[in-house]
Amino acid sequence: MKGTYYINHGDPLMYLKKHIKLRQFLEGWQENVVIEKPKSILIISAHWDTNVPTVNFVEHCDTIHDFDDYPDPLYQIQYRAPGAPNLAKKVEELLKESGMECEIDTKRGLDHAAWFPLMFMYPEANIPICELSVQPSKDGIHHYNVGKALSPLLQQGVLIIGSGGTVHPSDDTPHCPNGVAPWAIEFDNWLEDALLSGRYEDVNNFKKLAPNWEISHPGQEHLYPLHVALGAAGKNPKTQLIHRSWAANGVFGYSTYNFTPTTQKTD
């Protein structure tokens, strides 16, 4: 594959609202973003947190409805994609070769950070999928190094996607329905500038440098998939902003990025 991606999985209510810009972007994925059909997909999920990197090793992916108090139709959705056990084993091998731990989960399916965006991106559900967890107790550098260890997968036709939320405050954060909250814009702009300028060490150390990161990412698990995708693109990749929109509440940001290796061989 030509690069890695960091996407926003969005709110499950997007299933009922066709006008949402993020949904329209995801629906145009195969036509406008990744034309080539990947052999398999490795998706790093903000909604699977573990102590050490863990991959699901399954033949068929169950659909996990890991959200509460949503309309009944959302709980009827089934994304019946095949699993990618061979990819899971390769992820385990690459991480352990890099001196990291990796565990295998033989039961877990796909949570909504995985199946929900993929339902719009690849509605055919015919591409093998492997899910990788994040470690909220770790930092950006750890997740970048996880991605770096996985960069050889790009040469094997694997589409690597980090799925989270670029600005993802807690649910009780005051909304800004008449626009976008200034603190959210400031964080989003800082992240864009750091990525497009190649200041990847700053991105890895966002807790020391990014304005308003505490409110933008109180748990950080929704940003760490970005670090994995960034690391997986190899040394000094080129970053491109490929989508930007905001939730109607003015506090959840959906900026989406592509990380392209600067050489044919990643490292």
From Swiss-Prot:
Its cofactor is Zn(2+); Fe(2+). The keyword Oxidoreductase applies. Binds 1 zinc ion per subunit. Its EC number is 1.13.11.29. Expressed in petals. Not detected in leaves, stems and roots. Disulfide bonds: none annotated. Coiled coil: none annotated. InterPro entries: Extradiol_dOase_DODA, Xdiol_dOase_suB. Pathway: Pigment biosynthesis; betalain biosynthesis. It is found in: Cytoplasm. Zn(2+) binds at residues 9, 47, 168, 222. Keywords: Cytoplasm, Dioxygenase, Iron, Metal-binding, Oxidoreductase, Zinc. It is an enzyme of class 1 (oxidoreductase). It holds the Pfam family LigB. It catalyses: L-dopa + O2 = 4-(L-alanin-3-yl)-2-hydroxy-cis,cis-muconate 6-semialdehyde + H(+). GO terms for cellular component: cytoplasm. PANTHER family: 4,5-DOPA DIOXYGENASE EXTRADIOL-LIKE PROTEIN. Belongs to the DODA-type extradiol aromatic ring-opening dioxygenase family. Opens the cyclic ring of dihydroxy-phenylalanine (DOPA) between carbons 4 and 5, thus producing an unstable seco-DOPA that rearranges nonenzymatically to betalamic acid. Produces mainly (S)-betalamic acid. Required for the coloration of flowers. Requires ascorbic acid for iron to be in the proper redox state. For the same enzyme from B.vulgaris (AC Q70FG7), presence of Fe(2+) is not necessary to detect activity. This is 4,5-DOPA dioxygenase extradiol.
